[in-house]
Regions:
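N-terminal nucleic-acid engagement/recognition segments and initiation subdomains in replication
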Residues: 1-124, 138-143
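Solvent-exposed, amphipathic alpha-helical segments
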Residues: 113, 128-131, 155
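A short, surface-exposed helix-loop junction/capping segment
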Residues: 124-136
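N-terminal pre-Walker A segment at the start of P-loop NTPase domains
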Residues: 136-157
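Conserved small/polar residues in nucleotide/adenosyl-binding loops
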Residues: 162-164
Length: 164
């Protein structure tokens, strides 16, 4: 499969689409995929959220949205855009292309956030419960909170893990 392509102009994308013998745009998954990978508005917009097990729209695509999760209204807007801009009208093939693009662009918001953090060297676990709850700052409290936090973090990285 072609991975994410750099965005191109709409005219360049149209020129690269497969056509029928009569010169119309071929209603194919490949054409839909090409549009989702190269269109300046749609390129990089759809991703699979591993945490929620849903397809998300992760960047603005020209209409108001309440949530990142791809919903029926979003599909209608996408269908309208593809029909008006590229002449692509086969809903099933468009949906299949969305599935492929989302699968190629997976993310996990918690893992991504945790992986982006850089430790500044300050010891926080030892004094966290004392600061917020007034607990003793002893070795037992430290080890208990450390175990709890390590378990929470390991669950984000190893799906289904019950404990450390």
């Amino acid at each position: 499969m072609n991975a994410m392509q750099p965005p191109q102009s709409i005219e360049e994308i149209k020129a690269g689409l497969e056509t029928t013998e009569k010169g119309g745009v071929r209603q194919s998954i490949r054409n839909c995929l090409t549009v989702f990978q190269r269109d300046p508005l749609l390129s990089g917009a759809i991703a699979y959220n591993i945490l929620t097990d849903r397809k998300d729209i992760i960047k603005p695509i020209g209409f108001h949205r309440e949530s990142t999760a791809l919903n029926d209204t979003d599909m209608k807007y996408l269908l309208l855009y593809l029909e008006e801009t590229y002449g692509l009208t086969n809903e099933k093939k468009i949906d299949n292309a969305i599935g492929i693009v989302a699968n190629e662009n997976k993310y996990h918001p918690i893992r991504d956030y945790l992986s982006s953090l850089v430790w500044d060297g300050k010891e926080r676990i030892r004094f966290c419960l004392r600061h917020f709850l007034g607990a003793d700052a002893d070795d037992y409290t430290y080890e208990a909170l450390k175990l709890f936090l390590m378990g929470a973090i390991s669950r984000a990285f190893q799906i289904g893990r019950a404990h450390v």
